[in-house]
Design a protein with these regions (language model features):
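Small beta-barrel nucleic-acid-binding modules, primarily SNase/OB-fold domains
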Residues: 1-191
Length: 191
């Protein structure tokens, strides 16, 4: 930038000169500030993958993941495992097995979080698909590398679609049917 233009820019946008800005310049500055505040939250809306480490497994479908120095309580999208820690419900059939499977598979492990449309639930938990391999969106990659799908395939949970987070709902329904037909997990035992 030429020296004369640089001085003009610095003079126009120095802290003491806000009052002398034109309305157009003020709007431009406000838009820049607004975009700067939104930037950390874009990752939740774009479907990008965030890398983190599982620091705690709460139960079969809820984890705590450390992402960029921040601990996030994460609820897996599209799958519901039987309860083990609900304050008003007893431990449900196959709940201990689902929790043990999740702990064994994810405790201390590097994972990738994939957000869908709504990033948080009413309890302020992050809603995500959790990948244990580098993510890809083809069906084979989902079966092999997405933990939500693994829970369904192994019969540790049932599908649960809460709109608008339904990116993999059709595939998850097929995976549950496959587990049920094969008698895996909670589909294989008599109560």
């Amino acid at each position: 930038m030429p020296r004369a233009r640089r001085r003009l820019f610095l003079r126009r946008f120095s802290p003491g000169s806000l009052a002398s800005m034109t309305p157009r310049e003020l709007v431009f500055l406000l838009v820049l500030l607004f975009l700067g505040f939104l930037a950390p939250h874009w990752e939740r809306r774009t479907g990008d993958f965030l890398e983190g480490v599982v620091t705690k497994v709460v139960d079969g479908d809820t984890l705590v993941v450390k992402v960029e120095g921040e601990l996030r309580r994460v609820r897996l999208i599209g799958v519901d495992t039987p309860e083990t820690v609900h304050p008003r419900k007893p431990v449900q059939y196959y709940g201990r097995e689902a929790s043990a499977f999740t702990k064994q598979a994810l405790s201390g492990r590097r994972v990738w979080l994939e957000y869908d449309v709504a990033p948080l639930d009413k309890y302020q938990r992050h809603l995500a698909y959790v990948w244990v391999e580098r993510p890809a969106r083809d069906e084979d990659a989902v079966r092999r590398g997405m933990f939500n799908a693994m829970l369904l395939l192994e019969g540790y949970g049932r599908t649960m679609t809460i709109q608008p987070n339904s990116r993999y709902a059709d595939l998850f329904a097929r995976l549950q049917t496959e587990a049920r037909k094969a008698g895996r997990g909670l589909w294989g035992r008599k109560r």
